[in-house]
């Protein structure tokens, strides 16, 4: 039975000419022109919408007033100081984890502030504040350390370097 079906298929194939199926695919020029037209119309519409949003935003800008309840406020660079203080909470020591300082004068900061009039000089230096601490006699080593850092420094003992 197999031989009979195979022989019939071979005869039919020999007698009938082999024709290729026509492909009405993406290579048809009419379809390419149609797709180009759709893409052109899409580009024109998208450009028109973009320009409308861009030019309508400048007219609507005064309508959005800045306030306390606004989620995003624009930067106000008009009142910016050249050397502005970062931490507005005076009396907080960053080396003590933000705890309040126990000083006689809480307005006296830990660090020296830059002075605007001295910045005009090319090689001006920042002077050191006089420290009023009860030390162990060699306070020259501890300049600029807070009490918490000074205690840690005291606990560590300096070891002599081995000779080379």
UniProtKB/Swiss-Prot annotation:
Q: Which branch of life, at top level?
A: Eukaryota
Tell me the PROSITE patterns matching this sequence: ITAM_1
List residues, modification Phosphotyrosine: 64, 72, 83, 111, 123, 142, 153
Phosphoserine modified-residue sites: 58
Extracellular topological domain ranges are 22-30
GO CC entries: alpha-beta T cell receptor complex; cytoplasm; Fc-gamma receptor III complex; gamma-delta T cell receptor complex; Golgi apparatus; plasma membrane; T cell receptor complex
Q: Where is the composition biased (Basic and acidic residues)?
A: 83-96
- Biological process GO terms, please? adaptive immune response; alpha-beta T cell activation; cell surface receptor signaling pathway; Fc-gamma receptor signaling pathway; gamma-delta T cell activation; positive regulation of protein localization to cell surface; protein complex oligomerization; protein-containing complex assembly
Molecular function as annotated in GO: identical protein binding; protein heterodimerization activity; protein homodimerization activity; protein tyrosine kinase binding; transmembrane signaling receptor activity
Which locations, inside or outside the cell, does it occupy? Cell membrane
| Residues spanning the signal sequence | 1-21
| Domain remark text | The ITAM domains mediate interaction with SHB.
**PANTHER family (alphabetical):** T-CELL SURFACE GLYCOPROTEIN CD3 ZETA CHAIN
Query: Which family, according to the similarity comment?
Result: Belongs to the CD3Z/FCER1G family.
> Which disorder does the record name?
Immunodeficiency 25: An immunological deficiency characterized by T-cells impaired immune response to alloantigens, tetanus toxoid and mitogens.
- Say what the protein does: Part of the TCR-CD3 complex present on T-lymphocyte cell surface that plays an essential role in adaptive immune response. When antigen presenting cells (APCs) activate T-cell receptor (TCR), TCR-mediated signals are transmitted across the cell membrane by the CD3 chains CD3D, CD3E, CD3G and CD3Z. All CD3 chains contain immunoreceptor tyrosine-based activation motifs (ITAMs) in their cytoplasmic domain. Upon TCR engagement, these motifs become phosphorylated by Src family protein tyrosine kinases LCK and FYN, resulting in the activation of downstream signaling pathways.
The name of this protein is T-cell surface glycoprotein CD3 zeta chain
| Annotated gene | CD247
